[in-house]
UniProtKB/Swiss-Prot annotation:
One of its GO terms (cellular component) is ribosome. One of its GO terms (molecular function) is tRNA binding. It comes from Synechococcus sp. (strain CC9902). Belongs to the universal ribosomal protein uS10 family. Keywords: Ribonucleoprotein, Ribosomal protein. InterPro entries: Ribosomal_uS10 (IPR001848), Ribosomal_uS10_dom (IPR027486), Ribosomal_uS10_dom_sf (IPR036838). The gene is rpsJ. Gene3D superfamilies: Ribosomal protein S10 domain. Involved in the binding of tRNA to the ribosomes. Part of the 30S ribosomal subunit. It comes from the Bacteria. The keyword Membrane does not apply. This is Small ribosomal subunit protein uS10.
Length: 106
């Protein structure tokens, strides 16, 4: 019989429109995990989602004249293995920018 040890893992998903702000947030999370003796893997880049909006330039006629706008959503995943209570407490107190969406799964 083989015995498998269940290892705790925290998966953090980050989303942002600004890539630089997202990378700074990832660096802060990894630095916090490293200072509390937890092993962090990542950031793993996920595919960037592009959403394109087409808008008519003129309010009345000239449907041939259109303008395109796009939003790009950059995404990253960070896995933290064997977190301690100190690691979780430090991650909860971490101050991250408001433009970064964070989703945490235990």
């Amino acid at each position: 019989m083989s015995t498998a040890i269940a290892q705790q893992k925290i998966r953090i998903r980050l989303k942002a429109f600004d890539r630089r702000m997202l990378d700074l947030s990832c660096d802060k999370i990894i630095e916090t995990a490293d200072t509390t003796a937890a092993s962090a893997i990542g950031p793993i880049p996920l595919p960037t989602k592009r959403k394109i909006y087409c808008v008519l330039r003129s309010p009345h006629v000239d449907k041939d004249s259109r303008e395109h706008f796009e939003t790009r959503t950059h995404r990253r995943i960070i896995d933290i293995y064997s977190p301690s209570a100190k690691t979780i407490d430090a991650l909860m107190k971490l101050d991250l920018p408001s433009g970064v969406d964070i989703e945490v799964k235990l």
